């Protein structure tokens, strides 16, 4: 009985070849999503890749591939944009539910940033509003799951220190 020469070229090989082609195409195309796709996935258009590194801290590693497809390397930002000010809004009665934000708000750290105001807004989850030179809201970010160091680091990048 003669051995079949196409044994290794059978259906399993075809499946492997198809899978390899699909993976190669996905990795080439998926390296960067459109800004619309990223918004639909819930990612900001100014997402930094260093933020994707933090997903493990919150047991969100399943989001890493999409995060990497939507993020921008820090080196892509030629100039560091500083905002004129910021408002950190939070409800005083809900502050206990967000101990990391509470620790930041009640510490001396807010005094280190020029133009940072803490506003207590009834019913509001922690939100950071960055203001342009005219005092208008340029960006608004939910900081629900941010830790104290993340808030301080972000503000260090976006506001002038006193």
Swiss-Prot record:
Name recorded for this polypeptide: Selenoprotein F
Source organism (scientific name): Bos taurus
Family statement: Belongs to the selenoprotein M/F family.
Domain of life: Eukaryota
Biological function: May be involved in redox reactions associated with the formation of disulfide bonds. May contribute to the quality control of protein folding in the endoplasmic reticulum. May regulate protein folding by enhancing the catalytic activity of UGGT1/UGCGL1 and UGGT2/UGCGL2.
GO cellular component term, pick one: endoplasmic reticulum lumen
Keyword Nucleotide-binding carried by entry: no
Subunit structure: Forms a tight complex with UGGT1/UGCGL1. Interacts with UGGT2/UGCGL2. Interacts with RDH11.
UniProt-recorded Gene Ontology molecular function terms: oxidoreductase activity
Keyword set, alphabetical order: Endoplasmic reticulum, Selenocysteine, Signal
Signal peptide: 1-28
Disulfide bridges in this chain: none
PANTHER family membership: SELENOPROTEIN F
Broad class of the protein's primary localization: endoplasmic reticulum
Compartments reported by the entry: Endoplasmic reticulum lumen
């Amino acid at each position: 009985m003669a051995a079949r020469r196409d044994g290794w070229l059978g259906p399993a090989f075809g499946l492997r070849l198809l899978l390899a082609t699909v993976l190669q195409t996905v990795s080439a195309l998926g390296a960067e999503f459109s800004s619309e796709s990223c918004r639909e996935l819930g990612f900001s258009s100014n997402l930094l890749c260093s933020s994707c590194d933090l997903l493990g801290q919150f047991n969100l590693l399943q989001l890493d591939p999409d995060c990497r497809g939507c993020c921008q390397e820090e080196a892509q930002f030629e100039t560091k944009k500083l905002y004129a000010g910021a408002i950190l809004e939070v409800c005083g009665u809900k502050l206990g539910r967000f101990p990391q934000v509470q620790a930041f708000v009640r510490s001396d750290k807010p005094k280190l940033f020029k133009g940072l105001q803490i506003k207590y807004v009834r019913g509001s989850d922690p939100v950071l509003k960055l203001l342009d030179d005219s005092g208008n809201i340029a960006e608004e970010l939910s900081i629900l799951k941010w830790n104290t160091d993340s808030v301080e680091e972000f503000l260090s990048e976006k506001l002038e220190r006193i």
